[in-house]
């Protein structure tokens, strides 16, 4: 059933949990934290996926497999019927050095084992220069860097946990909502320095944005800060804190997919301009479409009575208007 690489991956996950004193119940490729829902706590299932065993079926290419909503349906059932959350870990994700470290950070947070906790009051908000923002995302965000119109970050006011004063430890980035037809803004990336937690950090960054920006400059366009959308990666996050931040749940996308090249291990998302070529590669047995759980969509309709704009003086610089 499993390849030697799968066995290695599973052993590494188990060893990491053991080394960090994380309690779990296990069965085959599933490591369940908070098994039995102690004190009503939602279980957290680390579910390993040998991706080549779960391709999306394409009968015309003689590919047996599953439906595109295979993982979404299991995630939905776990969330709504079993008081659990499934964190899907594809083999190619664990074998990616950068993503593996982000996943480890997720596991520690879920288990309450993060050792470096900061508080929002110990940080100041600044606009993050583009290069610094993309570098931070590349190291600390699961899906890496993504261009944005505005990058806001939390910087430490003093040294703590061996992290120097003035270090960027959390980021929120904003841009135009790519998928929406409305005049809305999207939270593009949210990331925290790996193996750290910033209590109250998301709230501080979001409030700063809402109170300091009436519009967002996107290219040559000024987009009013009225509607904000957030797409939560349902493969790895349940979006449990969104309501406390003022977002309302809208819908599930259902399943999505990534294209996986078997020979090189390369993984890419949907490429509309190369669709014909990708299908040719699939017909030749070189690529498989691997399903995922899709996203959960949340929206905020900005209430200006709750988030009144801060009046700025002409001499104020964006990085100095702190909240």
Could you say what each language-model-derived stretch is?
Residues 309-323:
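Short, cationic low-complexity segments
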Residues 60-98, 202:
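Catalytic cores of nucleic-acid endonucleases
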Residues 54-57, 95-98, 145-146, 236-241, ...:
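Short catalytic/ligand-binding loop motif for oxyanion handling, primarily in non-cytosolic enzymes
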Residues 260-283, 287-305:
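C-terminal "cap" of GNAT-fold acetyltransferases
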Residues 18-29, 144, 248-252, 283-290:
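Short secondary-structure junctions
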Residues 1-27:
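Acidic-basic catalytic patches of nuclease active cores, encompassing PD-(D/E)XK
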Residues 102-245, 249, 254, 297-302:
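A conserved beta-strand-loop-helix scaffold within acyl/acetyltransferase catalytic domains
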């Amino acid at each position: 059933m499993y390849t030697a690489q799968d066995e290695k991956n599973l052993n590494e996950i188990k060893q990491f949990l053991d080394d960090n004193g994380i309690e779990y119940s296990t069965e085959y490729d599933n490591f369940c934290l908070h098994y039995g829902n102690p004190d009503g706590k939602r279980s957290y299932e680390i579910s390993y996926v040998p991706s080549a065993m779960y391709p999306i079926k394409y009968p015309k290419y003689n590919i047996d497999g599953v439906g595109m909503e295979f993982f979404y349906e299991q995630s939905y059932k776990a969330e709504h019927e079993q008081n659990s959350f499934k964190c899907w870990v594809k083999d190619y994700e664990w074998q990616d050095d950068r993503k593996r470290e982000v996943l480890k950070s997720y596991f520690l947070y879920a288990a309450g084992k993060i050792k470096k906790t900061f508080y929002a009051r110990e940080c100041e908000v600044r606009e993050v220069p583009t290069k610094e923002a993309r570098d931070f995302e590349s190291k600390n965000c699961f899906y890496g860097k993504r261009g944005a119109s505005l990058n806001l970050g939390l910087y430490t006011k003093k040294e703590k946990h061996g992290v120097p004063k003035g270090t960027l430890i959390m980021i929120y980035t904003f841009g135009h909502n790519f998928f929406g037809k409305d005049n809305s803004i999207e939270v593009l990336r949210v990331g925290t320095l790996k193996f750290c937690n910033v209590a109250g950090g998301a709230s501080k960054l979001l409030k700063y944005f809402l109170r300091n920006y009436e519009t967002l400059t996107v290219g040559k366009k000024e987009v009013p800060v009225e509607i904000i959308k957030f797409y939560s990666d349902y493969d790895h996050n349940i979006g449990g804190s969104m309501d406390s931040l003022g977002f309302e749940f809208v819908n599930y996308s259902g399943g999505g997919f990534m294209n996986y090249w078997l020979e090189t291990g390369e993984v890419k998302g949907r490429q509309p301009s190369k669709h014909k070529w990708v299908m040719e590669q699939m017909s030749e047995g070189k690529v498989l479409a691997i399903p995922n759980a899709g996203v959960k969509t949340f929206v905020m309709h900005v209430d200006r009575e709750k988030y009144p704009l801060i009046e700025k003086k002409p001499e104020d610089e964006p990085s100095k208007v702190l909240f």
